[in-house]
Amino acid sequence: MNPEEIRQRRLQEMQAKAQEQGAANDPEAQRQAQEQQMQYEMQKQKILRQILSEDARSRLARIKLAKPQFAEQVEMQLIQLAQAGKLPIPLTDEYFKGLLDRIYEMNKPAKKEITIMRR
């Protein structure tokens, strides 16, 4: 099971539990959800520390500051690739840069061209 599937399952479980308790505004349910999110983040950071070299981790941290959504996507893909055994561990900064380029190219929006036809 990949981390994204685990995350989705946990989110569904938390939502179901909140609905069962009728606790849309219950501080206890919010605290539990926040605690589970923190545990998930800690687990993710632990895995990333094992996968990435120090330079690659600092690069990822800078990306996270500039583009949080892109960084989240990169983290998920790194974890999935590492679990599949498709990454050299620890991941060097040079390899990480190449991987970032490939991920960016896959996800960049299609270039829009506007042509003006004159009569």
From Swiss-Prot:
A molecular function GO annotation: DNA binding
InterPro entries reported in the protein's UniProt record: DNA_bind_arc, PDCD5-like, PDCD5-like_sf
Compositional bias annotation for Basic and acidic residues: 1-12
Keywords: DNA-binding
One Gene Ontology term, aspect cellular component: cytosol
Region (Disordered): 1-37
Family classification: Belongs to the PDCD5 family.
Name of the protein in its database record: DNA-binding protein MmarC7_1157
Lineage per the UniProt record: Archaea, Methanobacteriati, Methanobacteriota, Methanomada group, Methanococci
